[in-house]
Amino acid sequence: MGKLRGFIEFDRTDESYVPVAKRIKNYDEFTIKPSDKELEKQGGRCMDCGVPFCHSGCPLGNLIPDFNDAVYNKKWKNALEILHSTNNFPEFTGRLCPAPCEAACVLGLINPPVSIEMIEKYIVERGFKEGWIKAQVPAKRTGKKIAVVGSGPAGLAAAQQLNL
């Protein structure tokens, strides 16, 4: 997973922000995207833990070491597929989740943890930019209807899964 000694060679990098004076004039994204090379380095910081506690720290059970490794190896589309295997809406969670996975990261015991939330966010951004994310329209509608109570991530995920 990642680079064998990436956690030693690469320092943690976080997103930088647009100055407040500029961002109060619009509703655009206020973070500045790191370069793909920098994101790949951050993926390389993943240590290939024997027991990846980031997994259990993630409420969705995302395959974090796997998508970090894919990003490090420049396999962005594969990283997106890995992310979508456990997360219906990473475009939301990459922005809204408080990232308990980072608090559970083993590297965080001695150094700043892997930038998991940032990597997740930009995997999805890359997916939209490259056109890899498309609407999943069912081939045939059954005509049946169902109600999903709740409009949070779980309710939206249930609605998406039931629509397929």
Regions found by a protein language model. Give the residues of each.
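Ferredoxin-type iron-sulfur electron-transfer modules and their immediate structural context
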Residues: 1-145
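N-terminal Rossmann-like FAD-binding beta1-loop-alpha1 element of flavoenzymes
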Residues: 144-164
